[in-house]
Amino acid sequence: GMASTAGSVLGKLAKAVAIGAL
């Protein structure tokens, strides 16, 4: 559902931010 999709997108963004921070 939308919640699952939103969670996936947020997860990807979080990973991108974490990688960028490193």
Curated annotation (Swiss-Prot):
Its keywords, alphabetically, are: Amidation, Amphibian defense peptide, Antimicrobial, Secreted
GO biological process: any one? defense response
Quote the cellular component terms of the Gene Ontology held in the record: extracellular region
Residues with Leucine amide modification:
22
- Record carries keyword Membrane: no
Tissue expr: Expressed by the skin glands.
Q: Does the keyword Secreted apply?
A: yes
Protein's cellular compartments: Secreted
- Which family does the similarity line name? Belongs to the gastrin/cholecystokinin family. Magainin subfamily.
So what does this one do?
Antimicrobial peptide.
Q: What is this protein called?
A: Peptide PGLa-BM3
